[in-house]
Design a protein with these regions (language model features):
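NAD(P)-dependent Rossmann-like dehydrogenase/reductase catalytic/cofactor-binding core
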Residues: 185, 189-196, 221-231, 235-326
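General beta-strand structural signal in soluble alpha/beta enzymes
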Residues: 99, 124-129, 169-173, 232, ...
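Rossmann-like NAD(P)(H) cofactor-binding subdomain of soluble oxidoreductases
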Residues: 54, 60-142, 158
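NAD(P)+-binding Rossmann beta1-loop-alpha1 motif at the extreme N-terminus of oxidoreductases
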Residues: 1-52, 59-62
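Internal alpha-helical scaffold of NAD(P)-dependent oxidoreductase catalytic cores
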Residues: 82, 115, 119-123, 142-229
Length: 326
């Protein structure tokens, strides 16, 4: 199959490698020609995916229209904040569009497949999400993920396209739940990192993650998702790996906040985006819209955007009114 991948970061590059090794003709689009020139010379993406050799058959392209021309599938792997502008360039594209971007658009409250219905209305969107770090996928470490689409046939097509001996793809028709799980867990990962930065232990993080999955599910259901999706790979699975792994940008971002650094300065200095930072703002607005109680995410928002002291936020969570667990 002829495929274009939009976004030459870690995830786009790792998926490009995966799809080329699966026998597909793959073009990886990046917006900085000089970076692509480096990749052509070294057959590596040292900036975003260091230490990984890339197949020579992986085509690199800085011209967007050339990259997507005559393709049967486009994979979008760009930050959520530029997702609308980038996918608007797809125009009347009518093939499969697989989004691996995890975020919620602030102005509209839409997930990325929702944005696609506006920017590329003739395309068939599929969300691919789960507990995945690009470097582990690129090293062929066994990984499982979910392809979510309202169209069962589209999800199955993506399942067949991406599945390998080290990369197992499940399907779901709850695309909203799949995407919300992937987006909201990044906010919780920042909370987990703040806990680490404050020097708290395993008890604290276990309690945080367990209570957080409850509010992720509560908000997701209010938005129209299925509750069971949040205990699957794209919910609980992704939450666990992002909150506990040393690879997690969002957890690392939170750890720096917990140690006293300013969130905006951390974000400005990062090469790769910590999606939980903008998503905290979007999730807070979404929860207010649906009148859903999200105490953990509320405190993350207050720390990141209102300058609240992290230790005070933890005290406020612990001193909330006592209640049954379930």
């Amino acid at each position: 199959m002829k495929i274009a991948i939009i976004g030459a970061g870690a995830w786009g590059t790792a998926l490009g490698r995966l799809l080329v090794l699966g026998g597909n003709e793959v073009t990886l689009w990046g917006h900085v020609p000089a970076w692509l020139d480096e990749m052509r010379q070294t057959h590596r993406n040292e900036r975003f995916l260091p230490g990984i050799d890339l197949p020579r058959a992986l085509h690199l392209e800085s011209d967007f229209d050339r990259a997507v021309r005559a393709t049967e599938c486009v994979v979008v792997a760009v930050p959520s904040q530029v997702f609308r502008d980038v996918t608007r360039r797809l125009g009347d594209y009518s093939g499969l569009v697989v989004t691996v971007t995890k975020g919620i658009e602030y102005d509209t409250g839409l997930t990325m497949s929702g944005v696609l219905t506006e920017t590329a209305p003739q395309a068939t969107p599929v969300a691919l999400s789960g507990p995945t770090f690009a470097v582990e996928v690129a090293r062929d470490i066994p990984t499982a993920i979910v392809a979510g689409s309202r169209h069962a046939g589209a999800a199955q097509a993506v399942q067949a396209l991406f599945s390998r001996s080290s990369f197992r793809v499940y399907t779901s028709q709850d695309v909203l739940g799949v995407e919300l799980g992937g987006a909201l867990k990044n906010v919780i990962a920042i909370a987990a990192g703040i806990s680490d930065g404050l020097g708290f232990g395993d008890n604290s993080k276990a309690a945080l993650v367990t209570r957080a999955i409850v509010e992720m599910r509560r908000l997701g259901v209010a938005c129209g998702a299925r509750p069971e999706t949040f205990t699957g790979l794209s919910g609980l699975g992704d939450l666990m790996v992002t909150c506990f792994s040393r690879h997690s940008r969002n957890r690392g971002f939170g750890e720096r906040v917990g140690r006293g650094e300013r969130p905006a300065e951390i974000a400005a200095g990062m090469v790769a985006v910590a999606e939980g930072y903008p998503t905290a703002r979007s999730a807070h607005r979404l929860a207010r819209k649906h009148q859903v109680e999200t105490p953990v995410m509320d405190e993350v928002y207050a720390i990141l955007y209102e300058g609240k002291n992290a230790e005070q936020a933890v005290r406020d969570l612990m001193l909330r009114d006592l209640k049954p667990e379930i």
